[in-house]
Amino acid sequence: MRIVIAGAGEVGYHLAMSLAPNHDVIIIEKDVSRFERVSELDVVAINGNAANMKVLRDAGVERADVFLAVTGNDEVNLLSGLAAKKVGAKNVIVRVENPEYVDRPIVKEHPLGYDVLICPQLSLAQEAARLIGIPGAIEVVTFSGGKVEMIELQVMEGSKADGKAIADLYLPQNVVIASIYRNGHIEIPRGDTVLRAGDRVAIVSKTEDVEMLKGIFGPPVTRRVTIFGAGTIGSYTAKILAKGMTSVKLIESSMERCEALSGELEGVRIVCGDATDIEFLIEEEIGKSDAVLAATESDEKNLLISLLSKNLGARIAIAKVEKREYVKLFEAVGVDVALNPRSVTYNEVSKLLRTMRIETLAEIEGTAVVEVVVRNTRLVGKALKDLPLPKDAIIGAIVRGNECLIPRGDTTIEYEDRLLVFAKWDEIEKIEEIFR
């Protein structure tokens, strides 16, 4: 497929890197240093303004199967998206940072002609709400048009899974543990693998079966949630959670902002105060929270809030992190989940591309996850156990038409099956060769 990307920032660069091996990728970037960086990839790079019609025509946007507008400027993204659609691009996906342009994380079939508008701020809020809603969840990735979810969960101390072999967990029939991240290393588990507190497990499940996982790896429900920062992310997360949580508290330092939201967020207790004041946190009983979300405008403040909350007894701490390079640092010092808006955008765009039959990679704790389509007739009718897969590779799910199957060794492959394969990064080329 022909894919034109406007913007070679973090999102655009990583999309180009993942798509280039299997597609014709053209990327437009105005900044010289970013242009030079992306030029090193196997792509056609054009130095120019994506809102300029001549630049768009030089990129051949009229022949594009997909046009992705992910520059750091909302107006450039919106204008280039309109122009791309007008001259013939089949699918146009536009990122907008300002939530005034959209009222939900993803808007499809926009009246102005965009196929998809994505708001990173609202998408991050939605992701935070999903993680809080599944106790122990660290990351959730959707595949195959929403039929399959890959969830990374942390095994909590004293949970049903702590100290048990996988075979003894009696997981629901359509659920499989595909990988375990333990002590900095990835393991592909077997039935006799014993889980331990602190393990991070990647689980593949039918979307409708996710609810059945609650209570196995952590507590069954999240009852008390505290959110720090009443900006777009904090207030939208509170709005989502208030529909199903027993107690949602939103803490904000600005009295003006608190007053503005007081009549808007039904079921949310809004408190004005300094989130870095330890006495205030004790008074508000933050230590009794099942989950806290630090969503202020400062990375440093979010880190401090998270660590203070955990120290007081909060079970899970999630923090918004603007600087992508801080994500690993936050998690290394005790933050359970660090969410970066640009990473969330990348994941959302990748998810949309998968629904357009563009196969892309995902990653959970260093394990590569690739979705492959079976079109090699030599493989049709073969049982999974007879495939020459690398020793540590595992097929986590099969999507067949509108049906999702959690496979066993004797499951046979059919033409056009979509397989979700977990493997180590250095084995991806071999896997692609098998299904080519």
UniProtKB/Swiss-Prot annotation:
The keyword Disulfide bond does not apply. It comes from Archaeoglobus fulgidus (strain ATCC 49558 / DSM 4304 / JCM 9628 / NBRC 100126 / VC-16). The RCK N-terminal domain binds NAD and possibly other effectors. This is expected to cause a conformation change that regulates potassium transport. Pfam families: TrkA_C, TrkA_N. Keywords: Ion transport, NAD, Potassium, Potassium transport, Repeat, Transport. Gene3D superfamilies: NAD(P)-binding Rossmann-like Domain, Regulator of K+ conductance, C-terminal domain. One of its GO terms (molecular function) is potassium ion transmembrane transporter activity. This is Trk system potassium uptake protein TrkA homolog. The keyword Transport applies. Part of a potassium transport system. Residues 1-118, 222-339 form the RCK N-terminal domain. The lineage of its organism: Archaea, Methanobacteriati, Methanobacteriota, Archaeoglobi, Archaeoglobales. NAD(+) 1 binds at G7, A8, G9, E10, V11, E29, T71, G72, R95. Disulfide bonds: none annotated. It comes from the Archaea. Residues 138-219, 356-436 form the RCK C-terminal domain. NAD(+) 2 binds at residues 226-253. One of its GO terms (cellular component) is plasma membrane.
